[in-house]
């Protein structure tokens, strides 16, 4: 894990400084190793709004005392904040408050409040300082908080004892949960902003137990404004379309029946027709391989078999995916489904004619015909199906 690697580096540096002399140790102690940042809106302005930037710093002395592990009577980090309309100004203000210099090369996570990112260009402007710094890593993970972003960096994170580390670890779970999207890296987001492509970022929510990743924030390509979000359930449909989710569970609940289908493999094939360049047709075929994780039914007289169960799974999954499509295509009108890229590869000549009005201007994306066909296969059912069901 990147964060664990960072903690080891800081601890080794601190111990090395102690062994080699006071001057090097003092230099390390004077640095505030920033591992996470959070940005919230404070005051509306015509141009850039006033933001509150919160920076989580690791304390090398605490790490060396604890042997690099979480625990102890005190936290091994501090959060420092400042209010300004730019990151540089916030850093300047913080420099007057504390004795440490903020050191950013090892930052792992940046969290924005959804309210802040509802303003055009704020994401791009705020990330600019991170992108321009040649010492900054390109794999910083980006998140959106559905409420206060600072609160995410304050939540209890034991046994990790570093909220930023805990958030970084959460991002490892998406392959097992289709209600979460894959972690977004700053380098990937920069590429999409440069090419004016719409994109998504994972949403963080505070719960009684701590923090969870659930759902997706939708960003418009032309001005990287957050135009809305998808719930965890709605995110499932999007994940299957873009073909980046190969795991997770899909549950169907009917009157007297519950089916939980565990997906192990997903293959996607998209057929495109650009006969009408401004109203293309996309036929999306999803071939799934999985097993029955759970099956409940009370009508024992009703004879079910694998084909019938596969049909039920197919119909319900198509229904939910079409619901997700309707939201992003008709309500938010942003191509986070990446169908523009499919169009581009299929017919580059026609794509050049419509690209500037794909999901902006005339917004041809919102009028495209998108149909989904789900082909599930139940593997190794064995004793999972009662005799009457097989």
UniProtKB/Swiss-Prot annotation:
UniProt cross-references to Gene3D superfamilies, sorted A to Z: Nutrient germinant receptor protein C, domain 1, Nutrient germinant receptor protein C, domain 3
Cleavable signal peptide: 1-21
Membrane topology: Lipid-anchor
GO cellular component: membrane
Main location: membrane
GO process terms (BP): spore germination
Keywords, sorted A to Z: Germination, Lipoprotein, Membrane, Palmitate, Signal
Lipid anchor positions (S-diacylglycerol cysteine): 22
Pfam families xrefs: Spore_GerAC (PF05504), Spore_GerAC_N (PF25198)
Cell location: Membrane
Residue positions of covalent lipid attachment, annotated as N-palmitoyl cysteine: 22
Similarity annotation: Belongs to the GerABKC lipoprotein family.
Physiological role: Contributes to the L-alanine germination response.
Name listed for the protein in its UniProt record: Spore germination protein GerLC
Taxonomic source organism: Bacillus cereus
Gene assigned in the entry: gerLC
